[in-house]
């Protein structure tokens, strides 16, 4: 908030690279606030409105704004709102503020996961699962998220392979705690409780 206030008072003091960094930090702030139960819904809404105002003032695409709103709506259990924001997200063009092509689709995969639209989740994830797009956290992050969709849509072998490949990549990364949770859920559902307990014991220090 300090950097944003300084930019609003003296925009000429920021070069293009610093402004771009501010765009990214602001969208991350909205995501973190939305996931923190200690931050009130009203405060999150204020941040969303400020994000839109900031992006519009710089002529940025609303793609990121709609994407963040969709994610926050999902966290708040507002799936109709999430669906509307996702539709707007798909309809707006990506720009330099958007997540990479490997990570950006996770918004729709997450929505499909929450609403049990298993085929949509798998179809959205295909470019990442096939290696057509990737980054430092992909495909392993998406692989963990689609474990249940793969299983529920009748692809048990693909789910097991995704589990093995994803876990191999995340096992040394404490920042992948959420991904680990998907693996534990999957292992419980397929009756591999022994392996699930083994992974839980191995990663207790992440908690």
Question: Which residues fall in each region the model found?
Answer:
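Amphipathic alpha-helical protein-interaction segments enriched in hydrophobic
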Residues: 137-141, 174-186, 207
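Tandem amphipathic alpha-helical repeat scaffolds
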Residues: 20-37, 61-78, 102-115, 141-152, ...
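N-terminal low-complexity, intrinsically disordered segments
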Residues: 133, 149-179, 187, 191
